[in-house]
UniProtKB/Swiss-Prot annotation:
SMART domains hit by this protein: Tryp_SPc
Membrane topology: Peripheral membrane protein
Gene Ontology MF terms: heparan sulfate proteoglycan binding; heparin binding; serine-type endopeptidase activity
Keywords from the UniProt entry: Antibiotic, Antimicrobial, Chemotaxis, Disulfide bond, Glycoprotein, Heparin-binding, Membrane, Serine protease homolog, Signal, Zymogen
Record lineage: Eukaryota, Metazoa, Chordata, Craniata, Vertebrata
GO CC entries: azurophil granule; azurophil granule membrane; extracellular space
UniProt-listed PANTHER family: AZUROCIDIN, KALLIKREIN-RELATED
Signal sequence bounds: 1-19
UniProt name for this protein: Azurocidin
Function in brief: This is a neutrophil granule-derived antibacterial and monocyte- and fibroblast-specific chemotactic glycoprotein. Binds heparin.
Length: 246
């Protein structure tokens, strides 16, 4: 992975407003995660190659970004739970096909409502390596000073290879201002940043999945990572989980 670097990362939880160009997101810098540290983390793959991440929120559902499947056929994708070393066929792994996808008005032109639920072909077996992540209540906010984490197997920036092990970035919510009409929170990290490779991975604050990695924006030599604000979609998520597609 690239050397650790100092830089401010403005990670925004979006609900409305038009924002900049969308790209993938991955963890650059940070540290290597420990085994079973993020048992809810899902690797979304096509032909064995990761292209997005997500979080297990129900034994049959993974929460990720709708932009992950823009122009992609979900029938050719798979979801891997319980993975740690992507180069090994670990006994902890559980691999699923996707039975259905549920969106909530995703608008790719304006990057709105970039959230998606993947229904797995069967229930995941919960183990120390496969667990559910709790979600925040509807309309909940994250206060400045809150410590959060982002984890994933994002690409190594120089060689464009996916990380063998998940990387984790510790961030702290700040009171940095956002652009007009943006609904966001800022986070600051001295150990890395989000760049390309892990769209859909969760932003976890106090044990709750508060955000879903959506896209990046570069402005004034700074990279701002934007996360869909999960709390704005909690009621919709519950409606899908309680009434799954047939």
């Amino acid at each position: 992975m690239p050397a650790l670097r100092f830089l401010a990362l403005l990670a925004s939880l979006l609900a409305t407003s038009r924002v900049g160009l969308a790209t993938l997101a991955d963890i650059v810098g940070g540290r290597r995660a420990q085994p079973q540290e993020f048992p809810f983390l899902a690797s979304i793959q096509k032909q064995g190659r990761p292209f997005c991440a997500g979080a297990l929120v129900h034994p049959r559902f993974v929460l990720t970004a709708a932009s992950c499947f823009r122009g992609k056929n979900s029938g050719s994708a798979s979801v891997v739970l319980g993975a740690y070393d992507l180069r090994q066929q670990e006994q902890s792994r559980q691999t699923f096909s996707i039975r259905s996808i549920s969106q909530n008005g995703y608008d790719p032109r304006q990057n709105l409502n970039d959230v998606l639920l993947l229904q797995l072909d069967r229930e995941a077996r919960l183990t120390p390596s496969v667990a559910l992540v709790p979600l925040p209540p509807q309309n909940a906010t994250v206060e400045a000073g809150t410590n959060c984490q982002v984890a994933g197997w994002g690409t190594q920036r120089l060689r464009r290879l996916f990380s063998r092990f998940p990387r984790v970035l510790n961030v702290t919510v700040t009171s940095n201002p956002c652009l007009p009409r943006d609904m966001c929170i800022g986070v600051f990290s001295r150990r890395g940043r989000i760049s390309q490779g892990d769209r859909g991975t969760p932003l976890v604050c106090n044990g709750l999945a508060q955000g879903v990695a959506s896209f990046l924006r570069r402005r004034f030599r700074r990279s701002s990572g934007f996360f869909t604000r999960v709390a704005l979609f909690r009621n919709w998520i519950d409606s899908v989980l309680n009434n799954p597609p047939a």
